[in-house]
């Protein structure tokens, strides 16, 4: 696959937590609260009114155009990381300090946490569906799965 996965192949995200990841992109159609919205045991969206309820976020490059805050979201993300059900990477429309805390605590505990980047909701929509690699410099590179 080539750079046609994005309308703008030079698009780069702002690095919030460094790292690399690869996986299928999951572009959320609506904001999500991790607290009460994601099952920490399965990595499945359980927020009943969410359009993607029932979809697993585990191992995916999760594009969050916006989040619905709860201070407990960091604990849910930490449980997802501990249980091996976390997203491969977090792509946030705007930095969410609460989710980032979950990743930072996981790293402090010696667990591998997903990298996190900021990419506007508009730019997230430009990502084609498919498999991507999030490069260390924040580039979203379409790749074969």
Model segments located where?
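Polybasic, low-complexity association/targeting segments
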Residues: 2-27
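Feature captures the catalytic cores and cofactor-binding loops of soluble hydro-lyases/lyases
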Residues: 14-17, 26-136
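Phosphate/diphosphate-binding glycine-rich loops and adjacent basic-rich segments that engage nucleotide
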Residues: 137-145
């Amino acid at each position: 696959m080539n750079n046609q996965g994005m309308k703008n192949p030079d698009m780069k995200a702002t690095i919030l937590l460094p790292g690399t990841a690869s996986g299928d992109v999951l572009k959320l159609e609506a904001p999500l609260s991790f607290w009460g919205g994601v099952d920490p045991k399965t990595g499945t969206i359980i927020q009943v009114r969410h359009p993607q309820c029932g979809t697993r976020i585990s191992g995916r490059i999760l594009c969050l155009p916006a989040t619905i805050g709860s201070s407990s979201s960091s604990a849910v993300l930490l449980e997802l990381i501990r249980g091996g059900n976390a997203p491969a990477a977090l792509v946030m429309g705007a930095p969410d300090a609460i989710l980032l805390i979950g990743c930072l605590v996981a790293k402090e505990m010696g667990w591998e946490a997903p990298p996190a980047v900021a990419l506007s909701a508009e730019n997230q929509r430009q990502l084609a569906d498919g498999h991507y690699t999030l490069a260390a410099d924040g580039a979203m590179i379409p790749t074969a799965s």
